[in-house]
Amino acid sequence: MVDSTEYEVASQPEVETSPLGDGASPGPEQVKLKKEISLLNGVCLIVGNMIGSGIFVSPKGVLIYSASFGLSLVIWAVGGLFSVFGALCYAELGTTIKKSGASYAYILEAFGGFLAFIRLWTSLLIIEPTSQAIIAITFANYMVQPLFPSCFAPYAASRLLAAACICLLTFINCAYVKWGTLVQDIFTYAKVLALIAVIVAGIVRLGQGASTHFENSFEGSSFAVGDIALALYSALFSYSGWDTLNYVTEEIKNPERNLPLSIGISMPIVTIIYILTNVAYYTVLDMRDILASDAVAVTFADQIFGIFNWIIPLSVALSCFGGLNASIVAASRLFFVGSREGHLPDAICMIHVERFTPVPSLLFNGIMALIYLCVEDIFQLINYYSFSYWFFVGLSIVGQLYLRWKEPDRPRPLKLSVFFPIVFCLCTIFLVAVPLYSDTINSLIGIAIALSGLPFYFLIIRVPEHKRPLYLRRIVGSATRYLQVLCMSVAAEMDLEDGGEMPKQRDPKSN
């Protein structure tokens, strides 16, 4: 009885219930994610997720360890170049493996379900909900604090506004994909314009002769290997997000062209903006002011913009809002693909029958973020995943090299020289080693969180469905059925129109 119910739910995409067919094709319209992300949307998604609040609030991490303006700018440039290498590797992976899910999909393709599940488990427990909750809290703090100029804003006020922000963006992305991309475009423009204002103000000051901070700019530099490593690590953390578009590969129009082109446009934009923004900061503020500031851009605005200094706190809030939207889009697709591959409950990979949005996965992601908002010391959780993040990014690139060897004749619309993935792999070894050395306890906790998924994988995921406990099958079947009705959703069909794609994998049957 239970099994038949589940198969009935899964078969419903074949029912002729798609009223939105445009008449171009004789059969019923497929229920799958639609290709609605254009080149411009792709650029805004990457830029919007890479440029968060960090460049406004705390770009001083690089300066602390480099100890000079000159060396810090060099490290920002090196961090940008390294990120370009990683983004180019992901461009090849995204055009070769045309599945959403970024590193999860690539690890699954190269190494199978076990490592892919551990990557998904880490994202589910720590990376995605923690980062989204923190971005939402930062947004709320910058919106609420001006109302309490002489004291700290109430804890409940910022958390409630953060929750409202998560709910609003979840609703927008549930309604229409186009609404989500429109929000992303608008808020990306806003944050870029704010940084351009900072850059222009700095250049004007520099043109007026305020160049004293750049005299002997390398004086006092710390060339110790450990300090340079930590400075570079801080820079690379600010550049994270270049893989955002790979989470939505199946929704990109003409991905063979637009995915690598979006990456190729976005990376120079962000790198140049980061370097010039720091030049502007260094022109106006001395090292002591920067290191003492809790929000460098706000300190900069107080000295430059006068009565218009409110622009920067507002820009930080807008930047967080856009970054949160990009994170919600990416994370929901990760959970969607994880469900489709059998690593999460089937209900999460369903799609709204009229709007063609992954409503269940968006709701699941939103609920997880709201739960983590209830954690009072949530900022501590962010320290646990640096090791895991870079480990799985590096493992994806190792998978790229492995697939080059295992499947040399596989169609690759974009094929890089092996120089790029090899260099990136060597650098990720460094990025994995740095947190183990500098933040050993938190890194070990992060590893333990990742390994906590082992019992779940071997006792549930790897067990064939008919051998799972009857009560569990009944609960999952009932939840799937009710969620399907509640969300007006059916199981998504796999998009196989691109050559080389494999049909839906279910982990218990793999290997």
Swiss-Prot record:
Its main location: membrane. It is found in: Basolateral cell membrane. This is Y+L amino acid transporter 1. Disulfide-linked heterodimer with the amino acid transport protein SLC3A2/4F2hc. Keywords: Amino-acid transport, Cell membrane, Disease variant, Disulfide bond, Glycoprotein, Membrane, Osteoporosis, Phosphoprotein, Transmembrane, Transmembrane helix, Transport. The gene is SLC7A7. Heterodimer with SLC3A2, that functions as an antiporter which operates as an efflux route by exporting cationic amino acids from inside the cells in exchange with neutral amino acids plus sodium ions and may participate in nitric oxide synthesis via the transport of L-arginine. Also mediates arginine transport in non-polarized cells, such as monocytes, and is essential for the correct function of these cells. The transport mechanism is electroneutral and operates with a stoichiometry of 1:1. In vitro, Na(+) and Li(+), but also H(+), are cotransported with the neutral amino acids. The modification Phosphoserine is found at residues 18, 25. One of its GO terms (cellular component) is plasma membrane.
